[in-house]
């Protein structure tokens, strides 16, 4: 169960200030809360989390136990860096009404984001890819649902940059602690 809860929390934290949530909010504001959009959000969250979980299951069989903890530390550090350096894109001038196009964009955004990297790392570290996948999908889907429901006011109601920077700092501190623990410096 730790894999499920850790994946849920880290995925949700990583998604709050992320591009997929921002894009979802902007599209929802423009399209008027289209129900198809929320279905696409959940579908892409599930598919990308499943891909990350599958990749983690494969990697777990290839790694030594000590390397698994360092992989989690690396995931935390890279995710921290991604959130720190992320620039929000401009709102689409003429967003498409095609749910297929929206699905492709959300899929591309999510397949390489911090939340999926956490699902991958937690699948490797815990040996529970199904639980990590479920947690990642639930955490990501919940944030995308919130972005969808708030629509155009997502950016106005949430201080996204301070949230993103705060979460980045938390992930960096966690990366240092996990790395020191994996190396046996702290116990």
Over which residues does each language-model region extend?
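Interfacial loop-to-transmembrane junctions
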Residues: 149-172
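Transmembrane helix exit motif
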Residues: 73-95, 174-187
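Interfacial loop-to-helix junctions that mark the boundaries of transmembrane helices
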Residues: 58-69, 127-136, 158-166, 187
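Juxtamembrane transmembrane-helix termini in multi-pass membrane transport proteins
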Residues: 2-57, 118-137
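Membrane helix-loop-helix hairpins that form the core translocation module of multi-pass transporters
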Residues: 32-88, 146-155
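Small-residue-enriched transmembrane helix starts and helix-helix packing motifs
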Residues: 1-16, 84-111, 134, 138
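Hydrophobic alpha-helical transmembrane segments in multi-pass integral membrane proteins
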Residues: 108-121, 172-187
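Small-residue-rich segments of transmembrane alpha-helices in multi-pass membrane proteins
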Residues: 44-48, 99-111, 165-177
């Amino acid at each position: 169960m730790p894999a499920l809860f850790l994946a849920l929390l880290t995925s949700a934290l990583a998604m709050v200030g992320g591009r997929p949530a921002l894009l979802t909010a902007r599209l929802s504001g423009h399209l008027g809360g289209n129900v198809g959009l929320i279905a696409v959000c959940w579908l892409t969250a599930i598919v990308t989390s499943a891909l990350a979980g599958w990749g983690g299951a494969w990697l777990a069989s290839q790694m030594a136990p000590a390397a698994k903890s360092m992989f989690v530390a690396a995931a935390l550090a890279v995710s921290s860096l991604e959130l720190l350096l992320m620039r929000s894109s401009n709102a689409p001038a003429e967003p498409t009404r095609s749910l297929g196009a929206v699905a492709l964009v959300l899929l591309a955004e999510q397949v390489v984001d911090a939340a999926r990297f956490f699902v991958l790392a937690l699948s490797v570290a815990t040996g529970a890819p199904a639980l990590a996948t479920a947690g990642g999908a639930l955490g990501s889907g919940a944030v995308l649902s919130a972005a969808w429901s708030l629509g155009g006011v997502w950016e106005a109601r949430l201080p996204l940059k301070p949230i993103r920077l705060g979460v980045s700092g938390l992930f960096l501190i966690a990366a240092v602690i996990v790395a020191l623990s994996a190396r046996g410096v702290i116990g």
